């Protein structure tokens, strides 16, 4: 059922979840654009065999679904089943893209640097730390979404403060991470003077920088938007939303299509190796009495079959 926005009071009407009348055409356009870039990421994940790319695929899918809901909401502004999920997905989707960038640089440190470390921290640990920090920002922002859609002004204000705190945390983590990226770039410059690099790394690193800048643009926009409340001039400006939120996120995903990590992280060491199982755990798997576990000098060990007359 198509509804008109004519005469609707978007400030005082609790039956609508929009700050203004959403436009149908641009919502459809970005739903298609995000669907295309996400579809490309799915194909590339299989082509380059980068299983960790599921993270960016989720982010792109959330964006595509969000704009599909926005298009549907433009036809029926009173249907909260369109508005509420849209706001949640739009708020949280960029955090998946952010996490993916953290994972990409972690693998670059692991693959390109001989010591596989940055600031003395292993590549695997760096990745885990920043993904966990991203999850913290995700949970903080996620906790605010239900409050932002409350009918009570005081609750909405609390939601705004929590959300701004969450994206503030996200930006703080990004700035720290950029410091790590700069350190990686410095170490790679030294590596290139002393030995051959495993392959081109600058295009992928510059893509990491660009993606973080695009996410930062979106964060600054959101901070300015919510600092004036849900009905400020910028919060009710749809053009600003598409220019400073939708477009940066699409460009971030698209740039990761063009300079996909799978094009640069190729061969042995391009992925984190699976951690070896501990000898004790392996020993417990052999309770049949047909052999014994012998510990090697490297701490790993091997299983030796016992003669038939010595088996339990």
What are the residue ranges of the model-derived segments?
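Intrinsically disordered, low-complexity terminal tails of fungal membrane proteins
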Residues: 1-3, 186, 190-200, 261-312
